[in-house]
Amino acid sequence: MTKSNETERMEESEETHSSDIRSASESDHASGSDHTESADEIPTADAEQGELEQLEKLKDDLARERAAFHNFRMARAKQAEIERDRTRSEVIRVILPVLDDFARIEKHSTLDDPFKAVITKLRSAMEKIGLTAFGNPGDPFNPELHEALFQNPSPDVQTETVQDVIEAGYCLGETVIRAAKVVVQVPNG
């Protein structure tokens, strides 16, 4: 071989070697960038996971706050209803003596038509707000509804029975505002 051929081969070999080195370097560089991207993706994935967890926590906190607010509103509405009933009860207790006076007047004397109309309107108004009278002669005696002022022994009854009503009792809805004051017949013996 001639020197020039030998030189050409060496140059080709160097070029091939340089080319191989460049290719390997580019390949390593590309692989390195893949490793870099993977390394970048991992923190990004962790960050996204953290953000998702924080978002879920915030959603949970919001749901809890909404539930707490709903419970507060319900409790407040219930408290307002209790206060309304208490206020109505107080107003009704003030009016009850007037109703009692009208009942006594009706029982012991005759009323003119205008007075009967006033009594009827007053009772109708009380019924509209939920006030009902109770306590009639012949009703079974109930200590939760009746206040016994007198007891009369009687052979005609088997159980304690209301004989006469001194003052009617009143309920506002299910709540007893005032027990009926009654005379009770009790069985002999």
From Swiss-Prot:
Subunit: Homodimer.
GO CC terms of this entry: cytoplasm
Sequence intervals crossing the membrane: none
Protein name: Protein GrpE
Gene responsible for this protein: grpE
This protein's UniProt keywords: Chaperone, Cytoplasm, Stress response
Species assigned in the record: Tropheryma whipplei (strain TW08/27)
InterPro entries: GrpE (IPR000740), GrpE_coiled_coil (IPR013805), GrpE_head (IPR009012)
Major site of localization recorded for this protein: cytoplasm
PROSITE patterns xref list: GRPE (PS01071)
